[in-house]
Amino acid sequence: FISCIYLQNKALIAFGMAKKTLYIFNPEHDMALASGVTNYMAPASARQMASDLALLPMWYADAGSAVLAPSAYNADFLKTKSELLSMDVALLTEPEVADGKDRKFSPWGWDPALRKRLMTLGADQAELPSADYMNILREHSHRLQAVKLLPGLRLNEYFCGESFYLNTLAECSAFVEGREVCLLKAPLSGSGKGLNWCKGIFTTFISGWCARVAASQGGVVGEPIYNKVEDFAMEFYADGRGQVVFAGYSVFHTGG
């Protein structure tokens, strides 16, 4: 359930229906939002993913829209797929961002670093979320929101799931040592990242990790481990104007 709520923050936000959309794949979004800084530099692996999969939005982009990507090795691929599948999606490079003022932006996720990047490229600031909006987004992306909402999702005895917000090292220690196994999470982190699996012992390493996370993000989220059958998430689409609809399921396939 925590993942379900958290993934709502992956929603694509529109700022006007008449304008053409520029889609941006920025998989480092969660880490950038967690850092809260405008000059965030993603790890090399995340930057490589963003480059390799820059055209990913072409598969869900609206007709007549564009995808931000380097042209050197993406143009031919996009041209071939567009002709084969009758896709009306264009490629836009970074230097071209400043050329069009009549467009809206639809990234994988908003964060202060992306906002600054687009402003540096000459994007119309009126089409970008404000700095205040970024602060609100960071607050609502915090897993503390999921901790608060989770009890309301347990509609009857067939529902389970608990999540705890731990503010101090003493609370973290008591949570870990009071359970045979449990999971600690950084309140702001990417899917599958910022996790610490614990086996009933509050080690020096775990203590140090909790201290660092709490210092930068306000606390640590603790969750019990269940004898689960399947891992999946429910994904939602938010239109930016208060409407949220169920978009589908995301099922995880792992080697475990």
Task: Give the positions of each predicted feature.
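Glycine-rich phosphate-binding loop of ATP-grasp-fold ATP-dependent ligases
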Residues: E162-S163, C182-I206, A233, G256
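Conserved N-proximal alpha/beta basic substrate-recognition cap immediately N-terminal to
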Residues: L12-F15, A46-D62, L68-A174
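N-terminal-proximal low-complexity accessory segments that begin disordered
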Residues: K19, I24-F25, M31-M58
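Phosphate-binding core of ATP-grasp and ATP-grasp-like enzymes
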Residues: N227-G256
